[in-house]
Amino acid sequence: MLAPHQEEWTQNAERTVQVLNRLLEPVAVDIQHIGSTAIPSIHAKPIIDLVVGVRNLDDIAPYVELLKQHDIVFRGEDVAGQLLFVMGDFEKDTRTHHIHVVRWNGTEWNNYINFRDYLNRFPDKAIEYDVCKKKLAAQFADDRGSYTTGKQELIDRLLEEAHAWRSGT
């Protein structure tokens, strides 16, 4: 489930960001590599998370078919205020990328960016998160829902700290 950081994740993310920038140039304000694969000091599921910031979620609708032509498949609004696209080998049910489309500079955008930057800036916080993830991965090896739920309390606390750090308070 979890693997040590691999440099190829960063390189793959950079290539995918370039493709998305080209395809979504008129509507994407910014595209960033996020999630655990963007934090070199921690283990991660080998799925690259990217966030695409747009001014309005409706702006992405005209691009769904174009993205599909590039094997980027729309999965809907996975959580309120976010659209999810995925890449991978769907015959093998293997996802390689999760692409979250959110309102640029909105709550979701800031949460993703602040969390990544905070853990990259404070190695002790990254280690705390990594230890939690590894413990939960061992405990819930076949239950992704429980694994995700188990991390939430720590994620919420780290997000609070990240926002305070970012705002300088």
Segments predicted by a language model, with ranges:
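Short amphipathic alpha-helices in soluble, non-transmembrane regions
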Residues: 62-70
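Short histidine-centered catalytic/ligand-binding loop motif
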Residues: 1-7, 52, 115-119
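Active-site nucleotide-donor binding segment shared across nucleotidyl transfer reactions
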Residues: 20-61
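Short amphipathic alpha-helical segments
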Residues: 46-50, 95-97, 115
